[in-house]
Each structure stands twice: as C-alpha cells, then as structure tokens.
Amino acid sequence: KIAFILLCHKDPDGVIRQALSLAEGGDCVAVHFDGRAPDESYARIREGLSGVAGVTFAARRVRCGWGEWSLVEATLEAVKAARTAFPDATHFYMISGDCMAIKSAEYAHALLEREDADHIESFDFFESGWIKTGIREERLIYRHHFNERTRKALFYASLNVQRRLGLRRKVPAGLRIM
C-alpha cells in the first residue's frame, strides 16, 4: 500500500481532486497544506476531503519557504501523520500539489512489486546541470545563515565575508553529492 505524501500551498480544489484521485485506487494520502497559505483555503480542503477513507492531514501546518528546512519539517509532519493513520503502508511517495502523476498508481504498484528497491529521484550535484541559476559550489562550501530570497543583502554580505576570510568547507572525500 502506498501512502502518498502530498505537500501543497495553493489551489484547494486542485488539491481535493488530486487527493481523491490518489485515494480512490485503495492507497492513502497524507496532506500537508502550507501554514503560509490562507486558513480559508485549508478549511476548504478539510471540508472537501472530510470523511474520505484513506486521507489524513499533518497535525501541524508548517510555514514553508522555498529551499528552507521548513520543507523537510513539513514532509516529516505529513509522514508522521501517514504512519499513524496508515500503519499498513509499505511505501511513501512524496508528491507536490503542483504536480499530477504522469504514471498511474497501478504502474507504481507494479514497479514496486517487480523491483525490491527504493526509488529516490536524485541528480549528481556537479555533473547533472540540475542547478540552472545562482551559486553552485558555494552551496556546499560556505555556510548560509540567511535566506537568499528574503534577506538578499545579508545573504551575499555573509557569503563575501566568508570568501574574504577563506572560511571554505571541504566536501568530504569519497562522497558523491546528489
């Protein structure tokens, strides 16, 4: 049984449709709706999914910021809710509220039955070209105390101070950064 971990921040009606389509095949869904999103939108989702078997909600709505630890925290809240509500789940499948699955749940089940493996999407940090804009190696070798999006001046001032003082960290030997 797959427990879909649905992280979303907008479009309540789209979230409802997505959760219903994931749950109707017998799987389950744990929803985390961003704490920064309007309470009215969250209430709409709760109402729209009320009484639907196989749907649960994270106990706490985390205020999320792109690229921040808060996204990990929100994920963990949803996984905790899924583990509590659906103890028979054998796999956890994280999906964004902005994305609709391009493969069916049946496809995912067949793949999981066929292969005794966990599947985690990852990209080689240095070789993949996954990072399209902004800093690259600096993401690893310097410490980042400020959010680039919300405190841009402090972010770059901190980065420049570290560069001038030579406060580089080494990437641990033998690790392939994904």
Report residues per predicted region.
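ER/Golgi luminal nucleotide-sugar-dependent glycosyltransferases, focusing on the catalytic module
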Residues: 1-178
